[in-house]
């Protein structure tokens, strides 16, 4: 069994936008633009996380939109070379913990 890649899960900031926008282009056929990501970062009902590798590069990211007591995962993306390391699972676990702590009806 191979050793899993070490990542830190932190809130996404403006400093991560270029790497996240690049990740969008790599992973999705209709990616969110950098401007769309900026707008979502400013949305009080949205939360975005990034998984940073040991060199503080974005290995993955995920987004959550909360409407009333409902949580909606907007996007989950992991760099192709970083996949199969449990990164998406770690990102989603933070959102699951948030949903439970804030008594969301569903996620």
Each language-model region and where it sits:
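Acetyl-CoA-dependent GNAT
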Residues: 2-3, 11-83, 89-104
């Amino acid at each position: 069994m191979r050793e899993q890649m070490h990542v830190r899960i932190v809130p996404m900031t403006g400093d991560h936008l270029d790497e996240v926008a690049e990740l969008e282009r790599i992973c999705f056929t209709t990616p969110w633009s950098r401007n769309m990501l900026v707008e979502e970062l400013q949305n009080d009902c949205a939360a975005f996380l990034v998984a940073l590798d040991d060199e503080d590069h974005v290995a993955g990211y995920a987004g959550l939109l909360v409407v009333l007591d409902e949580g909606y995962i907007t996007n989950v993306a992991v760099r192709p070379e970083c996949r199969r390391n449990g990164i998406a699972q770690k990102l989603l676990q933070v959102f699951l913990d948030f949903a439970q702590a804030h008594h969301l009806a569903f996620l």
